[in-house]
């Protein structure tokens, strides 16, 4: 199980990827298959729709949590770029009372810099975290390759649900949202 060995880590991730559909309850897989249709029937503003999508994502990823090292206290992904949109900024502001910076900073290379919401090795806005944080789940047995110094040095299968992605993109389009890094909106 020594996942410092790249081949071992990739094999473990591939095995876990093969198990994903077996650990997710059928009703969730069926709902994911009809998610775009579900989105078409939703009423409300983009923020309301995003919150509903977050609820679904949380259900699906809860089922997959047995296959991933992603747990509270692992902060590797909190040190890579975190893309957010205006509608996600609104979710964070309304959910936490934290206000965005008055002046949005210029884009920068945020790789290796901690997320402004990382406090005591935990996400302080976990319930209101952005989409990218919800869906960024690795399938290796350990978080060794998640370290920002190793991230992007090797390829691993990542969890991805096509209908979830389509609905998220539709919400962004509806909100006319432009992406930025979370550190631009909320960093010092």
Identify the meaning behind each predicted range.
Residues 1-76, 80-188:
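Short loop/turn segments that flank or connect secondary-structure elements
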